[in-house]
């Protein structure tokens, strides 16, 4: 039974590698955070370890009200995809750079579990 599970895990790892090389979105998770580029702040992210998930895409969509008012608020979307199984913490910091200083206005830590089949599960948000 252990041998079969080991072989299955190896096959899944190979398939995930092929999927990643081809850029096919299969096992992804999305994070949506409020952002106001007019304020000078933007979201930055970092992983506590590499090789578990990677950024697949990010884009910003302004709110309809902010377009009309010119205040610039909207939503920043981050889509991550699985690379390998394991646990990973993604830290998001809402930062602004001014006068050689890095100012962090807000931060969140998302903890994910990626299973042996590439499924991504959000475990917690701090």
Give the label of every model feature segment.
Residues 1-4:
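Positively charged n-region of N-terminal signal peptides that target proteins for export
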Residues 21-126:
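Extracytoplasmic soluble-region selector
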Residues 12-23:
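Hydrophobic alpha-helical targeting segments used for export or membrane insertion
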């Amino acid at each position: 039974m252990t041998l079969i599970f080991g072989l299955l895990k190896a096959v899944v790892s190979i398939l995930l590698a092929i999927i990643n090389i081809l850029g096919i979105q299969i096992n992804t998770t999305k994070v949506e955070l409020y952002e106001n580029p007019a304020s000078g702040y933007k979201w930055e992210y970092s992983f506590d370890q590499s090789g578990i998930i990677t950024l697949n895409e990010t884009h910003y969509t302004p709110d309809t009200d902010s377009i009309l008012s010119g205040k610039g608020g909207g939503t920043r979307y981050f889509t991550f995809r699985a690379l390998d199984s394991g646990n990973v913490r993604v830290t998001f910091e809402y930062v602004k750079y001014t006068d050689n200083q890095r100012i962090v206005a807000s931060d969140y830590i998302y903890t994910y579990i990626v299973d042996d089949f590439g499924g991504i599960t959000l475990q917690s948000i701090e």
